[in-house]
């Protein structure tokens, strides 16, 4: 038997669908929102609906954007000869915090994971290959240092090998099985500096 009205239970259920949010955290978030002034709740809801309605993926790199192409792809000061390949848009935010990389990005929107039924056709590898031109000299593979990230990096390296582009992998320093999102700036900076050709 639940102690909350149906509307509260539904909100808890929706929050619990978010990554890293369990039932207790979902309950705390729900109760916090219900205790906010009405105008703050309206602003929160408005921001959520606006973000969902206006944010899309950049047609070039796959990052989140409200303009197409995104601010990074359309920035004339970015080094167009280097593309850093990441698994998710959040990884771009992590890389940008380091302030060591001035090239372009490519978001795969996942990784190769046979255990989860994801193959190369399920992520944005074809789109990466389509971006290869004479201007691109290096592709840095910054997939996560876990089994899926390594498999994805090796597959991409194999696909790009005949295209006469240098393919490098970020260096050690990111723990195996770790997630790029949780790496500190110094570690990520060193991993980028020490990248190896594959």
Curated annotation (Swiss-Prot):
Keyword Ribonucleoprotein appears in the UniProt entry: no
Protein's UniProt keywords contain Phosphoprotein: no
Alphabetized UniProt keyword annotations: DNA damage, DNA recombination, DNA repair, Metal-binding, Zinc, Zinc-finger
Domain Toprim: 81-175
Zinc finger (C4-type): 58-73
BP term (GO), one: DNA repair
Pfam families in the cross-refs: RecR_C (PF21175), RecR_HhH (PF21176), RecR_ZnF (PF02132), Toprim_4 (PF13662)
Matching CDD domains: TOPRIM_recR (cd01025)
Highest taxon in the source lineage: Bacteria
SMART domains: TOPRIM
Gene3D superfamilies: 3.30.60.80, 3.40.1360.10, 6.10.250.240, RecR Domain 1
A single MF term (Gene Ontology): DNA binding
Role noted for this protein: May play a role in DNA repair. It seems to be involved in an RecBC-independent recombinational process of DNA repair. It may act with RecF and RecO.
Family: Belongs to the RecR family.
Protein name (record): Recombination protein RecR
Source species taxonomy: Bacteria, Bacillati, Bacillota, Clostridia, Eubacteriales
